């Protein structure tokens, strides 16, 4: 059954889970995987997936190392900033002590594989890689990382060609990666439009991820094949579904499960986000 969760209250209650060696805890694990991650946790491995990831830094800063168009790059995501990582971009999160970040990703399709790679220094040469169907990244990564640290490749720093795929399951993205942006500053700059009742997309329509900001007004969520995560940032709103009315106060969140219709009434001064990730909207390779 759907229930409200205060984001910061939930983080406070689960703060012990954000320390090493676990460093993360799932708030939701349905079609959408909504998780919060702490640190310190520095990594050498790069994760690759066919879906996108939303990052938001609740407390402190983080660094997301990525491979962008054949080059290594550090993306600094500061406290209060939001960022969308495109699909098929190798990425390696670097998190520090006393930080907490939100990450939203989706359940994988049965045809999709995730990859874990180590590169030779700052080159694009693959040192070690494993491809797998991802059910639970939190439990599946550790054995692969342990395998790497016990491997000949780790000891010698040289790849074993026979253990690398001649053709990966999919090509890496060639998209340019956007800069993180302050969520508060973006909302402030669009305050008039939001309070006039105009929903606005933070990242446009060229991604399968939709992060929509809503001000006062009403809307109906038709029955969808994907989950919808709602996060009330300011003011209040009421979500009605299945004959139940759920009031959302500032910082409350609600996961509307796939296949559920709902009505959403937002009061004057309300500001809220809606997050969806629909693999049916996957864009052509690029």
From Swiss-Prot:
Q: State the residue spans of region: Domain B.
A: 178-286
Q: Name one Pfam family in it.
A: 3-HAO
InterPro entries documented for this protein: 3hydroanth_dOase (IPR010329), 3hydroanth_dOase_met (IPR016700), RmlC-like_jellyroll (IPR014710), RmlC_Cupin_sf (IPR011051)
Q: What is its main location?
A: cytoplasm
Q: Where is this region: Domain A (catalytic)?
A: 1-160
The record lists O2 as bound by 43
Some GO term, biological process aspect, for this entry: which one? Answer: anthranilate metabolic process
Keyword DNA-binding: yes or no? no
| Residues where substrate binds | 53, 95, 105
Q: Which region ranges are annotated with the description Linker?
A: 161-177
Please state the Enzyme Commission number of this protein.
Answer: 1.13.11.6
Cited Gene3D superfamilies: Jelly Rolls
> Which disease?
Vertebral, cardiac, renal, and limb defects syndrome 1: An autosomal recessive congenital malformation syndrome characterized by vertebral segmentation abnormalities, congenital cardiac defects, renal defects, and distal mild limb defects.
Name assigned to this protein: 3-hydroxyanthranilate 3,4-dioxygenase
Give the originating organism.
Homo sapiens (Human)
Encoding gene, per UniProt annotation: HAAO
């Amino acid at each position: 059954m759907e229930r409200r969760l205060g984001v910061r209250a939930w983080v406070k209650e689960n703060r012990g889970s954000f320390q090493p060696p676990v460093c993360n805890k799932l708030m939701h694990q349905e079609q959408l995987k909504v998780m919060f991650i702490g640190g310190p946790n520095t990594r050498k491995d790069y994760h690759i997936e066919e879906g996108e990831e939303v990052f938001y830094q609740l407390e402190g800063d983080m660094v997301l190392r990525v491979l962008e168009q054949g080059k290594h790059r550090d993306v600094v995501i500061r406290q209060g900033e939001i960022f969308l990582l495109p699909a098929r971009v190798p990425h390696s999160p670097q998190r520090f002590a006393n930080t907490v970040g939100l990450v939203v990703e989706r359940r994988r399709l049965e045809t999709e594989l995730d990859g874990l790679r180590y590169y030779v220094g700052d080159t694009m040469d693959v040192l070690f890689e494993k491809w797998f169907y991802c059910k639970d990244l939190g439990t599946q990564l550790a054995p692969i990382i342990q395998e790497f640290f016990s491997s000949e490749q780790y000891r010698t720093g040289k790849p074993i060609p026979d253990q690398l795929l001649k053709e990966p399951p999919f090509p890496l993205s060639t998209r340019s990666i956007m800069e993180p942006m302050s969520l508060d500053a973006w909302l402030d700059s669009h305050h008039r439009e939001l309070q006039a009742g105009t929903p606005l997309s933070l990242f446009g329509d060229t991604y399968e991820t939709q992060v929509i900001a809503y001000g006062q007004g009403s809307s109906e969520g038709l029955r969808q094949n994907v989950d919808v995560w709602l996060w009330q940032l300011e003011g209040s709103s009421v979500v009605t579904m299945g004959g139940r009315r759920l009031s959302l106060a500032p910082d409350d969140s609600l996961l509307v499960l796939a296949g559920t219709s709902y009505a959403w009434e937002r009061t004057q001064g309300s500001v809220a986000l809606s997050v969806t990730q629909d693999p049916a909207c996957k864009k052509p390779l690029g």
